[in-house]
């Protein structure tokens, strides 16, 4: 009896210590992120930014360079801290898999992803935010910050997939508790607020049916409405996706191409499957988003929509930062020149 009580007390103390340690770790991460948010705010004030165009005739002073390098260094230290925490969680999982229930691993991933969100937003907003009253960020600084974002994104994706392989989290989008995707930052470009999300693995574009289309990223784009009071007011969000689709190239088509090039076609009997990457927009078809009939909305359990391709990116999967660059470039082109249209 005494041994049973002792074991229960030891278990309770262990769980309490682990909970306190997790809370301490989260507070430490949060404090460091808040500190670096203050640092990052000075990137956009124009104080230590310079035009890298050699024709400008401006060369940054040694003091300017030193201050900028110090700011980058402090943000990089925060990145290394988050990466080390990811390594620590992975080590705990691998070495403790025989007694995993004692470590509360099911809560680690959601908590850690949420903790990393402010740091992602710090990187994305500092690198991409546009302000008409401040000079643009130097390309070198922008590249470093986006590399930090890409590095952390890739590491978190690996960590989520590892925990999912041990059944500590679900990647099924239909599961309310799943971690099929996570936030990798937010930025403000002109009148657009862009929230960026990364799917941990190719996920069916429609959860209700298989279309052969799989999503890898999502962007929620909200446009600011002018003349709506003192505070900023945004229109309803538009949803854009980075998707892939396996396209079968018929053997006859391949043979024709090769025949025209003078190549032999005797062994070309199998079809080739090519994975094509594209960026497109979710367009709702039912209920009609422009209808004022509320009955359609009340009776509809799940809105219907389709994927409208905007950009074709080819066979190679782009990084999350490159894909975001492509989308923002297209959206800004549409805003400026009105030349951007949906590919039918």
UniProtKB/Swiss-Prot annotation:
Ranges that cross the membrane: none
Q: Which family does it belong to?
A: Belongs to the UPF0575 family.
Q: What is this protein called?
A: UPF0575 protein C19orf67 homolog
Q: Which organism is it from?
A: Danio rerio
